[in-house]
């Protein structure tokens, strides 16, 4: 008796070469339905339609096609159980040896703009997952394949007679993973369309890459991500393989950069061209400029010593002038929405430099959750998204910031939320001058930032991610000539800091919003 293959695929990639190999080289008979059968028939290959095999027509507009005992009995019957084989004989059911199924394109459907509820629901596959799960359960007798990338190995295994128990288990595991991911996608989409709170957090991400190691060489690490979303959608143009630390720094760079916008092309001359330099996930230089090269030079000038071995992110296309700013310094990675040909040619001389093109679309598609692990669980929170509402800011001192100072306060406020707490940023003329990160007390971070800025701090502004518990930071800021301070407020000693500002001639803005980063 010829082996039987059941083929029912939404993605028709590689279908005809597979069908030809099964029929012409391996002697299979093919059962199929719908568009899959139609395509096979168009190549004059023998195929039996599911409705002809089962004697039961498709009903409910195609909702019921393969949900039939003649299909599932043939898949689920164990060949080592005589009672199962007797049941097949009594019901005139043939055993099915190979199931090749992939599912309705639910992800593609819900990715469409303004997709309707009805269209999405109709693209929830029922028969496909049922066949896949049945075959995966009975993998000792039935091979199950769910992805066109598996076809070549499948045919090679048949031809070389290497259909081993291990291969069957491998395909079974991949099949269950396929249906689990599919169901999770549907569950999450429906949850997002309703107002009900999810009682469990479900996520399934494909393996993107095995990394060389984690933060340190003795730690193993892997990268999982949704295709075309976020960093999985980045195109690495050159350089060494990305490391765990590269990815963490790139994420920190992009998070900071998004405060100023992120576009593939610049059509509006007023668009803020910004550059960020990151070291150990902290910004060490941030600036806005009239051009990509100007923004980059000013960001690097913020702290050229710390920039050594860092990560650069630019929120607009990189041109020749910008590339020349990078040409003679040691940088691990550069990410931007686009590099022009001249820029790529200049930077190609730096063989180990990792260049990544990350399009705005990939950034926009990424999920807006911030996830961290704790022992035995996960903490999930909303991203601290770019958002400034100056209408809620309060000027609380006798002196009021000038328009220029307000622009710098807004700039510094955007930066400080991306510095590890306790965080202080000193800035002037849309350029960071000093960063104080990760100290256990706020005045310690202020000291680092002000010392880094040095004499440039005269007339500059200072931002703090949290309130001032005492007035010591204000007094230190005055010693360095700071003109204005922005901070959340909310301390029981706010009045002490405000009084100190008034005595020292410093302006202060309270935002009412904290930006801790742990």
Curated annotation (Swiss-Prot):
Keyword presence, Hydrolase? yes
Occurrences of domain MGS-like (ranges): 1-146
Q: Which GO annotations describe the biological process of this protein? A: 'de novo' IMP biosynthetic process
Keywords, in A-Z order? Hydrolase, Multifunctional enzyme, Purine biosynthesis, Transferase
Q: In which pathway does it act?
A: Purine metabolism; IMP biosynthesis via de novo pathway; 5-formamido-1-(5-phospho-D-ribosyl)imidazole-4-carboxamide from 5-amino-1-(5-phospho-D-ribosyl)imidazole-4-carboxamide (10-formyl THF route): step 1/1; Purine metabolism; IMP biosynthesis via de novo pathway; IMP from 5-formamido-1-(5-phospho-D-ribosyl)imidazole-4-carboxamide: step 1/1
SMART domains named in the record:
AICARFT_IMPCHas, MGS
Q: Which residues form a coiled coil?
A: none
InterPro entries, per this entry? AICAR_Tfase_dup_dom_sf (IPR024051), Cytidine_deaminase-like (IPR016193), MGS-like_dom (IPR011607), MGS-like_dom_sf (IPR036914), PurH-like (IPR002695)
Q: Which reaction does it catalyse?
A: (6R)-10-formyltetrahydrofolate + 5-amino-1-(5-phospho-beta-D-ribosyl)imidazole-4-carboxamide = 5-formamido-1-(5-phospho-D-ribosyl)imidazole-4-carboxamide + (6S)-5,6,7,8-tetrahydrofolate; IMP + H2O = 5-formamido-1-(5-phospho-D-ribosyl)imidazole-4-carboxamide
Transmembrane region(s)? none
Instruction: Fetch the PROSITE patterns from UniProt.
Output: MGS
Listed under GO cellular component are: cytosol
Q: Has keyword Signal? A: no
Name the Enzyme Commission number(s) assigned to this protein. Answer: 2.1.2.3, 3.5.4.10
Q: Which Gene3D superfamilies match?
A: 3.40.140.20, Methylglyoxal synthase-like domain
Supply one GO molecular-function term.
IMP cyclohydrolase activity
Q: Which HAMAP family match?
A: PurH
Q: What does the entry note on its domains?
A: The IMP cyclohydrolase activity resides in the N-terminal region.
Q: Would you identify the family this protein belongs to, as annotated?
A: Belongs to the PurH family.
| NCBIfam families referenced in this protein's UniProt entry, alphabetically | PRK00881.1, purH
How is this protein named in the record? Bifunctional purine biosynthesis protein PurH
Q: Which organism is it from?
A: Prochlorococcus marinus (strain NATL1A)
User: Gene encoding this polypeptide?
Assistant: purH
């Amino acid at each position: 008796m010829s082996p039987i293959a059941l083929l029912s695929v939404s993605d028709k990639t590689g279908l005809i070469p597979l069908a030809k190999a099964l029929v012409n080289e391996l002697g299979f008979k093919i059962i199929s339905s719908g568009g899959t059968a139609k395509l096979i028939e168009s190549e004059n290959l023998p195929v039996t339609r599911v409705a002809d095999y089962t004697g039961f027509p498709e009903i409910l507009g195609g909702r019921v096609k393969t949900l039939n005992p003649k299909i599932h009995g043939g898949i689920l019957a164990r060949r080592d159980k005589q009672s199962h084989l007797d049941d097949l004989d009594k019901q005139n059911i043939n055993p099915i040896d190979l199931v090749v199924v992939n599912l309705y394109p639910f992800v593609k459907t819900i990715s469409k703009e303004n997709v309707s509820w009805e269209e999405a629901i109709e693209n929830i596959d029922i028969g496909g997952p049922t066949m896949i799960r049945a075959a995966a359960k009975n993998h000792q007798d039935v091979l199950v394949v769910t992805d066109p990338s598996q076809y070549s190995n499948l045919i090679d295994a048949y031809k070389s007679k290497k259909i081993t128990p291990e291969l069957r288990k491998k395909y079974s595991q991949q099949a269950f993973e396929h249906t689990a991911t599919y169901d999770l996608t549907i569950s999450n989409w429906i949850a997002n369309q309703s107002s009900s709170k999810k009682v469990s957090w479900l996520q399934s991400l494909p393996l993107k890459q095995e990394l060389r190691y984690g933060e340190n060489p003795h730690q193993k690490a892997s990268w999982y991500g949704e295709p075309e979303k976020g960093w999985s959608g980045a195109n690495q143009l050159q350089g060494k393989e990305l490391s765990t630390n590269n990815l963490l720094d790139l994420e920190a760079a992009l998070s900071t950069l998004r405060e100023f916008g992120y576009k593939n092309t610049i059509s509006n001359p007023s668009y803020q061209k910004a550059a960020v330099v990151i070291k150990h996930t902290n910004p060490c230089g941030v600036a806005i400029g009239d051009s990509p090269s100007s923004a980059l030079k000013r960001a690097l000038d913020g702290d050229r010593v710390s920039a050594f071995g860092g990560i650069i992110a630019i929120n607009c296309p990189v041109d020749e002038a910008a590339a020349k700013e990078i040409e003679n310094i040691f940088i691990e990675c550069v990410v931007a929405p686009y590099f022009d040909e001249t820029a790529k040619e200049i930077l190609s001389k730096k063989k180990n430099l990792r260049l990544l093109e990350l399009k705005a679309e990939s950034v926009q598609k990424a999920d807006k959750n911030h996830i961290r692990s704790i022992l035995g669980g996960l903490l999930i929170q909303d991203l601290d998204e770019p958002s400034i509402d100056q209408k809620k800011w309060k000027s609380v001192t006798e002196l009021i910031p000038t328009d220029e100072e307000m622009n710098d306060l807004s700039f510094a406020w955007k930066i400080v939320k991306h510095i590890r707490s306790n965080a202080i940023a000193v800035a002037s003329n849309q350029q960071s001058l000093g960063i104080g990160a990760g100290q256990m007390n706020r005045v310690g971070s202020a000291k680092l930032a002000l010392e880094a800025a040095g004499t440039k701090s005269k007339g500059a502004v200072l931002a703090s991610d949290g309130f001032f518990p005492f007035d010591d930071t204000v007094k230190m800021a005055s010693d360095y000539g700071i003109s204005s301070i922005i901070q959340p407020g909310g301390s029981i000693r706010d009045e002490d800091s405000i009084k100190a500002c008034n005595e020292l001639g410093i302006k202060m803005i309270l935002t009412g919003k904290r930006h801790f980063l742990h």
